[in-house]
């Protein structure tokens, strides 16, 4: 069952966008996952752990997530929440991760872990979710950002002498923008996100970044401020 699901993700992303499996940001430090203790008011002393991820997105990021979830078995209850901070990575990796998160019915929060236990008032500060990370964010059944976080998009890289606007590392890739944008529209529509996100993406050169305002994120149904989020969401058993 899992193999069929993973095969479906790979086929859905790679066949649809072809060369868009290329980078939107050259991976520097791979996305890493960890379980973080939580202490929310409505589950005092019995709160499930929360998954926190930071780094750049690999081409097969959904496989990394599933491997982490398997390793987490036996480590107590885990909430269906992913806190993410990422400058981007492989486009197809972000798309596949988004599909996987939706399949797992996980909520996604953009933010940076401070090293403390997560409570309703501490443990997270503002973070960044850019480029390919936005596809992962869109996959969340509920989507939030910590106040002050930055969420941004741009066109995929083309040509040879291009620096990613977030990582400032060189990228060498060629993308069929027309077919890629058509697939992105389908993806965001499936996830319940307004196509205004793709319009901003298509209009922003690869060496720049369009950062959404909080109002735009709400209007495009991309994410809401986490201050409006109820604590202690569903947990995985």
Stretches with model-predicted labels:
Residues 10, 58-61, 213:
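A diffuse structural propensity rather than consistent per-protein peaks
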Residues 1, 53, 172-176:
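A general boundary/transition motif marking the beginning of the first structured unit of a protein
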Residues 18-23:
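Hydrophobic core
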Residues 25-27:
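N-terminal signal peptide c-region/cleavage motif recognized by signal peptidases
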Residues 80, 155, 159-237:
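Charged, glycine-interspersed solvent-exposed loop segments at helix/strand-loop junctions
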Residues 2-15:
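Bacterial N-terminal signal peptides that target proteins for export
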Residues 33-149, 153-155:
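Cleft-lining beta-strand/loop regions that shape enzyme active-site pockets
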């Amino acid at each position: 069952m899992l193999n069929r699901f993973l095969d479906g993700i790979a086929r859905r992303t790679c066949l649809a966008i072809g060369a868009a499996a290329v980078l939107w940001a050259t991976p520097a430090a791979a996305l890493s996952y960890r379980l973080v203790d939580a202490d929310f008011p409505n589950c005092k002393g019995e709160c499930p752990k929360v998954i926190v991820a930071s780094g750049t997105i690999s081409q097969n990021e959904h496989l990394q997530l599933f491997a982490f979830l398997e390793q987490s078995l036996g480590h107590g209850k885990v909430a269906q929440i992913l806190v993410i901070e990422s400058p981007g990575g492989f486009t197809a990796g972000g798309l596949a991760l988004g599909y996987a998160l939706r399949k797992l019915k996980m909520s996604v929060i953009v933010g940076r872990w401070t090293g403390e236990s997560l409570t309703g008032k501490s443990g997270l500060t503002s973070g960044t979710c850019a480029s390919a990370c936005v596809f992962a964010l869109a996959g969340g059944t509920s989507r939030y950002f910590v106040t002050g976080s930055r969420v941004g998009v741009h066109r995929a890289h083309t040509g040879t002498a291009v620096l990613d606007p977030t990582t400032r590392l060189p990228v060498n890739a060629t993308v069929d923008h027309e077919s890629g944008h058509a697939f992105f529209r389908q993806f965001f529509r499936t996830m319940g996100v307004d196509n205004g996100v793709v319009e901003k993406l298509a209009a922003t050169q690869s060496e720049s970044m369009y950062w959404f305002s909080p109002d735009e994120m709400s209007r495009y149904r991309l994410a809401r401020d986490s201050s409006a989020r109820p604590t202690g969401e569903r947990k995985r058993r």
